[in-house]
């Protein structure tokens, strides 16, 4: 028995069950991924014990020479990975990364232009229930009702009318390529700054499979998990002229001591992302997403914008008897994890929704490829054709578990 199993069997049991879920269920939540053993080893290290307020070479605590090495490695690797002037690897999350940028260049009441949450944006891009919507005057933009892609005519019209100080680009449920050059051109017409939140597509950007926002934006924020396949955390890239202000708005502005064990895990993940194999992995994520999207559409599912260019897709259930909530629950019983999601021009509550979101990063980390995506589409269709049929859903779960058993990832942790 492990030390944890001996001392706290309740926690140990929960961890084991979650390991089994990640090993044998099909994880299709677009914002989730599975890290490498090296990343987990770094995150579970003694660095969790060390306080290190400040920045490398300028700490408020002694004994930081080793963690300085780790943070500098993370910074330099991040800059190399994305071609950035400056990187701050201390944000605990993507939300805090966004907050730090806002506080660096905005005052309460300033106007920002951000993507409507129900059209695919993110809470921190100006949702009224989030700090971003409470502190700032938010003008939301969205997608065209015809194409379900970003309506740049609307973005330009709103920018000219409201003269935002900052235009926020990025999304949590947008399956198409983001045109950073178009946003930059609009921002320049009104003298606005640009912040790109590339949390969902950072891995694709690092691999050159999605245009980089770095040349077009004063600030680029991201999480370090999702497609980047690192630990749960955040990061900010910016132009050198904003580096000092940005750093001070992370610490002491909105955070105290950085999480050095997480920064170590970020450093390891960035090294992985700099390796040639990472591009092949990202290419497979996109191939899997496109195959799955095509197969779902063949089976009669409607996808927002008619497909995907990246790692995710949004299934629109409008006009069917299903809701996103019902679909999520049925698929969960079939061993397939997705999340209910609002769709553009949503008519239902965000607790119910008319759609669900699917992503391929975690399944790709397991080793699934195009052939398996054909099977996955069949599993999804079978489960959603049998909502309420517990026996049939259990049968589908058996097929899912058998499929995932062919692609072990953390099996050694279950011995």
From Swiss-Prot:
Keyword terms of this UniProt record: Amino-acid biosynthesis, Cytoplasm, One-carbon metabolism, Pyridoxal phosphate, Transferase
EC number: 2.1.2.1
PROSITE patterns, per the entry: SHMT (PS00096)
Sites where the protein binds (6S)-5,6,7,8-tetrahydrofolate: 117, 121-123, 241, 349-351
Molecular function via GO: glycine hydroxymethyltransferase activity; pyridoxal phosphate binding
GO cellular component: cytosol
Site residues, Plays an important role in substrate specificity: 225
Coiled-coil residue spans: none
Biological role stated in the UniProt entry: Catalyzes the reversible interconversion of serine and glycine with tetrahydrofolate (THF) serving as the one-carbon carrier. This reaction serves as the major source of one-carbon groups required for the biosynthesis of purines, thymidylate, methionine, and other important biomolecules. Also exhibits THF-independent aldolase activity toward beta-hydroxyamino acids, producing glycine and aldehydes, via a retro-aldol mechanism.
Quaternary structure and interacting proteins, as annotated: Homodimer.
Recorded family membership: Belongs to the SHMT family.
Listed name of the protein: Serine hydroxymethyltransferase
């Amino acid at each position: 028995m492990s030390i944890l199993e001996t001392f706290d069997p309740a926690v140990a049991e929960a961890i084991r069950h979650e390991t089994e879920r990640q090993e044998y269920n099909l994880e299709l939540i677009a914002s989730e991924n599975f890290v490498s053993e090296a990343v987990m080893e770094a995150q579970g290290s003694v660095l969790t014990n060390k306080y290190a307020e400040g920045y490398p070479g300028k700490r408020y605590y002694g004994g930081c020479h080793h963690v300085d090495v780790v943070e500098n490695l993370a910074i330099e690797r991040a800059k190399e990975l994305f071609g950035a002037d400056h990187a701050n690897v201390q944000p605990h999350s993507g939300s805090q990364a966004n907050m730090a940028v806002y506080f660096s260049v905005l005052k309460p009441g300033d106007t920002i232009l951000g993507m409507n949450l129900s059209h695919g944006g993110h809470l921190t891009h100006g949702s009224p229930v989030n700090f971003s919507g409470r502190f700032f005057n938010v003008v939301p933009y969205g997608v065209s009702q015809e194409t379900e892609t970003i309506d740049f005519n609307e973005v330009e019209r709103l920018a000219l009318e409201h003269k935002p100080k900052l235009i926020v680009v990025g999304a949590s449920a947008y399956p198409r390529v983001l045109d950073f050059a178009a946003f930059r051109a609009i921002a320049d017409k009104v003298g606005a700054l640009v912040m790109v939140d590339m949390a969902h597509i950072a891995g694709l950007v690092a691999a050159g499979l999605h245009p980089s926002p770095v040349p077009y934006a004063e600030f680029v924020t991201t999480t370090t998990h999702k497609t980047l396949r690192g630990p749960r955390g955040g990061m900010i890239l910016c132009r050198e002229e904003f580096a000092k202000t940005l750093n001070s708005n992370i610490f002491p502005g909105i955070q105290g001591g950085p999480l050095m064990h997480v920064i170590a895990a970020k450093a390891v993940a960035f090294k992985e992302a700099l390796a040639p194999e990472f591009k092949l992995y990202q290419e497979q994520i996109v191939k899997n997403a496109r195959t799955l999207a095509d197969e779902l559409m063949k089976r009669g599912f409607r996808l927002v914008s008619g497909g995907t260019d990246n790692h995710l897709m949004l299934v629109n259930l409008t006009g069917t008897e299903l809701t996103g909530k019902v679909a999520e629950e049925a698929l969960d019983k079939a061993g397939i994890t997705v999340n209910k999601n609002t769709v553009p021009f949503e008519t239902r509550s965000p607790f119910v929704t008319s759609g669900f979101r699917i992503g391929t990063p975690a399944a790709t980390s397991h080793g699934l490829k195009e052939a398996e995506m054909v099977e996955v589409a069949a599993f999804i269709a079978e489960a959603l054709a049998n909502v309420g049929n517990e026996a049939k859903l259990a049968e589908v779960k058996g097929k899912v578990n058998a499929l995932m058993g062919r692609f072990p990832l953390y099996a050694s942790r279950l011995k």
